[in-house]
A protein has these predicted regions:
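Divalent metal-dependent phosphate-bond-processing catalytic cores, especially two-metal-ion Mg2+/Mn2+ enzymes
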Residues: 2, 17-27, 31-43, 56, ...
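Active-site flanking loop/helix segments enriched in acidic
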Residues: 4-28, 60-70
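Acidic/histidine metal-binding catalytic segments
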Residues: 41-52, 92-106, 119
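His-Asp-centered metal-binding catalytic motifs of divalent-metal-dependent phosphohydrolases/nucleases
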Residues: 47-69, 80, 103-110, 127
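An active-site-proximal "capping" alpha-helix that borders the catalytic cofactor pocket
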Residues: 29-32, 36, 74-91
Length: 177
């Protein structure tokens, strides 16, 4: 791991201090995003943006809970970008272009109908890999995610490796396997 992402993880851990569930979640999403991005052969700039967005993707949860009494994904998309912008500005090692793309990804990571860019696709897949497990989703939900959400070869392989051995039939719902 590079120093920039290690420092971002430290800052986000401080931001989520006392909330191990959220810290565990973003760490797992980061690791899956980093893995998928590497296996998909992303260029260094896109990989950097992806990993930063994965670390920060749920930064809007606490403020959403305070403002709306809910951590619903749409509220996270509303509140997250500004919180992320503040944290990245304090760190002083993000360009304006990086900040804008990371904020865009955070502001759309629960919107699945118009995914634009490989970084966006991989962030969504990484978050799904973690959420499908953490939320103990049904076989139907996992199969549906495989069919409708996952597009990268690496993401599909990880999903199948994670869930097919448990009796879930993700592969039978993909036409392009």
């Amino acid at each position: 791991m590079d120093v920039k992402h290690a420092k971002l993880i430290a800052a986000m851990t401080e931001y989520d201090k006392g909330d191990p569930k959220r810290i565990q979640h973003f760490m797992k999403v980061h690791d899956y995003a980093a893995t998928i991005g590497t296996l998909e052969g992303l260029d260094a700039k896109t990989q950097d943006i992806l990993e930063s967005a994965a670390i920060l993707h749920d930064i809007g949860i606490h403020i959403s809970e305070q403002k709306y009494g809910s951590c619903n994904g749409k509220y996270q998309e509303i509140e997250g970008p500004e919180e992320a912008r503040k944290l990245m500005t304090q760190m002083k090692n993000f360009t304006e272009e990086e900040t804008e793309r990371i904020c865009f990804l955070i502001g759309h990571h629960h919107t699945y109908n118009s995914i634009e860019g490989i970084d966006y696709q991989i962030l969504v897949e990484a978050d799904f890999l973690v959420n499908l497990y953490e939320d103990r989703c049904s076989e139907h939900a996992i199969s549906s995610a495989c069919k409708h959400i996952f597009r990268t070869g690496a993401g599909i392989r990880l999903l199948k490796q994670m869930f097919d051995h448990n009796g879930y039939k993700t592969s039978s719902h993909r036409e392009d396997d």
